[in-house]
Amino acid sequence: MWRVLFLLSGLGGLRMDSNFDSLPVQITVPEKIRSIIKEGIESQASYKIVIEGKPYTVNLMQKNFLPHNFRVYSYSGTGIMKPLDQDFQNFCHYQGYIEGYPKSVVMVSTCTGLRGVLQFENVSYGIEPLESSVGFEHVIYQVKHKKADVSLYNEKDIESRDLSFKLQSVEPQQDFAKYIEMHVIVEKQLYNHMGSDTTVVAQKVFQLIGLTNAIFVSFNITIILSSLELWIDENKIATTGEANELLHTFLRWKTSYLVLRPHDVAFLLVYREKSNYVGATFQGKMCDANYAGGVVLHPRTISLESLAVILAQLLSLSMGITYDDINKCQCSGAVCIMNPEAIHFSGVKIFSNCSFEDFAHFISKQKSQCLHNQPRLDPFFKQQAVCGNAKLEAGEECDCGTEQDCALIGETCCDIATCRFKAGSNCAEGPCCENCLFMSKERMCRPSFEECDLPEYCNGSSASCPENHYVQTGHPCGLNQWICIDGVCMSGDKQCTDTFGKEVEFGPSECYSHLNSKTDVSGNCGISDSGYTQCEADNLQCGKLICKYVGKFLLQIPRATIIYANISGHLCIAVEFASDHADSQKMWIKDGTSCGSNKVCRNQRCVSSSYLGYDCTTDKCNDRGVCNNKKHCHCSASYLPPDCSVQSDLWPGGSIDSGNFPPVAIPARLPERRYIENIYHSKPMRWPFFLFIPFFIIFCVLIAIMVKVNFQRKKWRTEDYSSDEQPESESEPKG
């Protein structure tokens, strides 16, 4: 089993102003010239659209890719997932072509005007309704990359070109409809990048899936967007780090949290300001529930059209379709889908003969069975809870599907007629549900997978495991030699093992001083347009990854050059990958690697670790725990949160976020219990206090009255005494 990472050649240096032409936006008014309606739904339509002064006829046919029970999900402020109260129509998405251009592709929605993409063979145009227009005006603009500097031409021009090859018939032997049910997650930064509006973001995801569907027409595959999840307030997992690390983190999260949302494959879409890699997935594992997933990294400068190509390539790789060898693989278009350069080209893209052969091999195997089930694509106009559709909706406590579905999975907790829990049940499924009851709060539901990760426990009142937490970034790890970064110990030894395999360890300082002072394949601090960058003295530990080899045989890494150097008795090794190699980023030290006291590597420079924002002092958790990524103390075993100052022998450790909080009081240790209850504001100890307050107030008032009365009596006595003495005083002679 192996995973595939995408390298986007040169994308890290792309700038919108230097790589994309500034193209004029045109105003057009689409004219509907034909419409066919079946059962109240417009199944076909034709529009006349003017592009650059020339009218084109666009023929459309309805293309459903949203199931009847499609929902968009987000999380509440308490971290509970909930469906958004929005209706999204599934009958207004269309696919078609431009008349006179048989190799053209059109993918638009007509829910609110025409919104989508028109692709000629090598030029693409975007179209969307003009806001606040009263005359059905639309804007249309060319999506053009400088690298695809070609002009629009029609079919007769295509026929006149000298095609040096002809495609053989390599269609899959079983030409039946196939379906890929996909759950898509948009993380917070990409949500903000796409407009920070649920309707706008959903429309863009619909357009992305529509474009991807157009690519897979030749395979007779429909990509079904089974559900959409938006991380609006915060990400549920750390989305930093390299693509392969993020893939593993996502798949672990997916296993715990996506059990209630049926899907064949799940994809996490992540925004990156710039990135060399654009995604990761496991090859040929489309129908393997443990590995059917991928991550798509969306660099700032690419278009939605290019993002669809990336998604299509990832889906293809997960079906065992490999990258094209441009010397052996051919297609009738300007560029083939599985050409790594395809994302740089506008226009229609199709699969090569090699891709057809790979797909035919995949579909002939048992491992492709998940593509054979057809979801319901009935039109829907308003979302309503439907008991028996295997989807948990508003007003339902459970929904295991039809009677046959529930019997198949052995459902015993859910009343299939009412979609309510049976008497005596409080859950039906989930990592913290057992025999229809919530597991007790001391039950671990997600163990830590390494020292910078933290375990989570069932909270005793939910079937779900709490969200994943990890040690705060910046905390020491690896015997205080390294630092935790987003839940992973950024160990030099681990980086060496990941790059070279066994029998390696992190290189000594002599190796770094000698090799990274060079400016060649053996040592450097990165690559720029002018060549290798020389490391300054302070940055030697942050340049090329240099390891110490203790093995006996020469290392073998495909498509890589391994450099050996004997320095001060150490066999130091470095590696040089081709620029388009999936592991090319492993040539250098990762960001977050320690490079000195209170210093870490960042972009091949050794900088202060203060930028990590680590502020967990030993006093905060009384030296009996660590801070988690929410900056709360995760206490060691037998010490209680929130500050790990109180001891309880039966407490397994944890934080206020780990699920097993608050702790159960231990009757044998009454003083400790009182202290704990004061910490957590437990109600049983507070009601006597509130009962005492009115009596205390009354007592104070009575005391005040008594004092005042006593004072008044003294005052009266003083006045009486003064009045008795006054005449005598006045009779004194005035001298």
From Swiss-Prot:
PTM per Swiss-Prot/TrEMBL = The prodomain and the metalloprotease domain are cleaved during the epididymal maturation of the spermatozoa.
The record describes its membrane topology as:
Single-pass type I membrane protein
Q: Which GO terms describe its cellular component?
A: cell surface; plasma membrane; protein-containing complex
Q: Which residues carry this modification: Phosphoserine?
A: 729
Entry annotated with the keyword RNA-binding:
no
Can you give the propeptide residue ranges? 17-174
What this protein is called in its record is Disintegrin and metalloproteinase domain-containing protein 2
